[in-house]
């Protein structure tokens, strides 16, 4: 958090008012021993020191305060220039998450992505908008966006992974020769991502998730052993000890 973001979010330059917001927030967090500290090198920046709290807060807000959480995100996007966000090049990689926007806003996030696109029309924005459209079953729009993202940054494994996800989701509910070819292409893309990317966990998890779906719904168990082998490898090498990996 920095003062420029707070000024824009609250639409005020009154330092006294902003200071009251910060003090109140620090007071709430101190009650649960979670510090919101000023940056040593720049006193206008504040950092939440607990990643665990941030993850738990995210889950609670999404599950129990969806309306309020959505209102804050919408206000942030409409009021705050992305140019004011500290380390935006890092922020954008996971910001504006397509699944989160689908869960919070339903079909009403298209305008938010248009707003974001005014500032950043890059591959990561296109990737998340494509995933959002996929969650809304707008597969035509999803493919248009993910293909554009690939044309911008075709070597990015995360974007390739997203293309595989969209391709799978668009074809999993129908059993035709074309859909079978598309499913095979999606699984092969994930296989290549797992083989070539140093960050293997998400590729393996998605491959396993899709393998289970195909076994249950298509009676096609041909991918299960491969998925099991990958997950065992990740657990054995301690690349992933997550409960989701072990659950799969």
Residues covered by each model-derived region:
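"A position-specific structural signal for the A-helix of alpha-solenoid helical repeats
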Residues: 128, 162-169, 206-213, 247-248
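C-terminal leucine-rich, beta-strand-based interaction scaffolds used for sensing/assembly
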Residues: 2-140, 149, 161
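Short, intrinsically disordered, charge-balanced linker/junction segments flanking boundaries
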Residues: 1, 244-247
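Short helix-capping/linker turns of helical repeat alpha-solenoids
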Residues: 121-122, 154-156, 160, 198-200
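TPR alpha-solenoid repeat register
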Residues: 125, 159, 201-203, 243-245
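Alpha-helical repeat scaffolds
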Residues: 72-77, 105-117, 140-151, 177-195, ...
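Short coil/turn connectors between adjacent alpha-helices in alpha-solenoid helical repeat scaffolds
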Residues: 63-67, 94-106, 130-141, 168-184, ...
């Amino acid at each position: 958090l920095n003062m420029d973001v707070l000024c824009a979010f609250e639409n005020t330059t009154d330092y006294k008012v902003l200071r009251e917001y910060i003090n109140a927030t620090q007071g709430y967090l101190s009650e649960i021993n979670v510090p919101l500290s000023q940056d040593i090198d720049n006193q206008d920046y504040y950092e939440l020191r607990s990643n665990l709290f941030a993850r738990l807060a995210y889950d609670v807000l999404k599950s129990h305060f969806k309306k309020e959480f959505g209102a804050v995100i919408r206000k942030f996007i409409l009021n705050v220039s992305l140019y004011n966000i500290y380390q935006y090049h890092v922020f954008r990689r996971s910001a504006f998450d397509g699944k989160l926007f689908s869960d919070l806003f339903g079909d009403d996030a298209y305008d938010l992505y248009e707003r974001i696109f005014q500032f950043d029309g890059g591959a990561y924005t296109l990737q998340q908008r494509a995933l959002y459209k996929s969650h809304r079953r707008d597969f035509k729009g999803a493919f248009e966006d993910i293909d554009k993202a690939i044309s911008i940054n075709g070597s990015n494994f995360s974007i390739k992974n997203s293309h595989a996800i969209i391709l799978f989701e668009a074809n999993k509910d129908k059993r035709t020769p074309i859909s079978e070819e598309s499913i095979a292409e999606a699984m092969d893309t994930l296989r290549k991502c797992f083989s070539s990317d140093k960050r293997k966990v998400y590729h393996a998890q998605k491959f396993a998730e899709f393998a289970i779906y195909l076994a249950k719904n298509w009676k096609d168990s041909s991918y299960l052993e491969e998925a099991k082998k990958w997950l065992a490898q990740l657990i054995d090498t301690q690349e992933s000890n997550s409960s989701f990996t072990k659950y799969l």
